[in-house]
Amino acid sequence: VDKQLAEYFRLPDDPRFSFAYSNGDGRTGFFRFANATCFGKISGQAPASSLDQPLPEVALRQANSGEQPFPFNPPDLIDSIRSECYASHTNGAGEKSLPKQIARIGYYAVREILPVTVRRHFQRMYLSGWQDLPFPKWPVDFTIDDLHEQFLRERMLANGVTQMPFIWFWPDAASACAIMTHDVEAAGGKAFCSRLMDIDDAHHIKSSFQVIPEVRYSVEPAFLDSIRTRGFEVNVHDLNHDGSLFKEREEFSRRAVKINRYISEFKALGFRAGAMYRNQDWMSELNLSYDMSVPNVAHLEPQRGGCCTVMPYFIGDIVELPLTMTQDYSLFHIMEDYSIDVWKRQIDLVGGRNGLMTFISHPDYLQDDRAQRVYTDLLAYLDDLRHERNYWIPLPYQAAQWWRDRRAMRLVKSSNGWTIEGPNANRARVAYATIDSPGLRYSLEPTVAQTQPVG
């Protein structure tokens, strides 16, 4: 079974589900396949060089069992979209333009002396037009998830398979997963962390705190211990949050040495880059278990793009937990929305696809009463969904470890049906993907106690 499908679904080994793929020909560009905007190489047609042009529609080819019907290489297509190779070809990739690079340098040079009202005005100008970006799709993009389902469905059809077993996405039959994370941006936010832990605890939700190691504020061992001893998690947040971590490779490598030292000193497993700047190809230089720097859709981030999936995935051996929910700062200060309506919409969308809901809220921006009320409304809503919809709300490192364990599990056929072997297999469940035009329908194998519908 192909690596991407194996990691996404954890299917049983079956040679019928492996193909020799076409690598496509000609240049790389945009096209449409199965109602999804795609970016890669295709055979027999010329893709569009930008989203401003008409996108050619790509159809499946007639194929017999064992032959691949796709006029492109599905694994390469998944990689090129999820790793954001398309971003430099879109109108939204303005981060690479000279005016925006100059604006970013100027902004970070004076950021610390600017009040939030001035920063907000500057950021709105910088992000202007975000509502008009056609790809990725806001508020949540499911391109990678749709493609995985389509690829599996077509292979099932080609082999006369109507139902396929796989290892369910989350432990204990949870229908979806939500994680709360807090990026601590300045000294005022650091001082509010204890109070924020009180608020989280009041709603029975543990969270992670991403701490900036240098420049912004002092980081005492006692501060880190105050987080860990209460059952919360400490991660590293950039190096100094100056917006230049990924500016050029040599400087990144120099900073990576220091970041790795702080990862060890902080006893951290996870990392998030400042302002969601990122280059997935460079992440292997960081000694991480998991990363949280890649948005699902980045229309409201200074670096546009997005991985277009609501599931964790691997960058080498690092588990990526993508940001799938709008940040609190963007909601309050860019969209000027002091309600949980946008979050509820995103929760419904991601939960409906059994995905990961990653939230970023900042202790720096939750200190006024209005913002705090919105945040507590969100926590109360998530706590309700934990019981009503069987959402799993772990610490981020637990979600990453589950995804790592799940990759090491395998489905084994026995006289009693399918069983799961591997680390934490006692928490895993056998699920089934059933062809349900035009997509797939998921169900969990019933236990003695109950049958649990999903999706």
Where are these regions (language model features)?
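Catalytic domains of cell-wall/extracellular-matrix polysaccharide-remodeling enzymes
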Residues: 215-216, 243-323, 333, 340-343, ...
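Conserved beta-strand positions in the central sheet of alpha/beta enzyme cores
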Residues: 235, 272, 291-292, 358-360
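Terminal accessory/targeting
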Residues: 1-210, 214-218, 285-286, 316-455
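Catalytic cores of extracellular degradative/oxidative enzymes
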Residues: 168, 184-280
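Short amphipathic alpha-helices and their capping/turn segments at secondary-structure boundaries
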Residues: 221-228, 308-314, 345-349
